[in-house]
Amino acid sequence: YMAEGAKDVLVLDGGASATYAARIEGSDKLEVRNSPSDGAEREVCSSLLIVSTAKSTGVFDHASLTPNNDLYTPGYEVQFSASGIDTAGFPMAVPADATWALADDSKDMGTIDAKTGLFKAGDKTGTVNVQMIQGGKVIGTTAVEIAVPDNIYFNAEEVSLGFEDESDLSLVVRNKDRDLNIKDGDIVWTMSTEGLGTFKGNTFVAHSKDSLH
């Protein structure tokens, strides 16, 4: 770190319990941004706080777009959303005349509704660069990936369910060690024992007690 130009370095707990929380652009809430070993922030902890004393200006600067850097299968419908950011980094309304568009290098990756931001992926794989435009100027950008699975497995050999319970059966779908969002129909499900339940998309729904004879 010193070689990179740091003058002072603090070494905190480097274990898996370390928790990072931040207020991301477009939000007024502090949220945990990593995956601590306990699954959540500990009730008792030592903390280092970085607090901004800036005040909202109410002057629009740019739009923060989500999702970002997520993976989806071909044909997936992705709903993009935007939050306005003022010059001090505080949330504000997005200009009413702002519209959605695909960047020139992504126009062959699918279609996007200019008003709603609903993107429908095509059959190609690769990066999709999405823009928000106002008055011919790009005021926000984000990107997602369209990919196919290279690893599909279950996290558990058995799953116990009650009547009418729903479960994803601990299915994990990944591409290059990253979680991949799949749509209904991407996986064809079969059961060795009929009558125990049905699939609703990629979710298994156990039958009710009355349905068993």
Label each region the model flagged.
Residues 58-67, 150-157, 197-199:
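Proline-enriched interdomain boundary motifs that mark the N-terminal boundary
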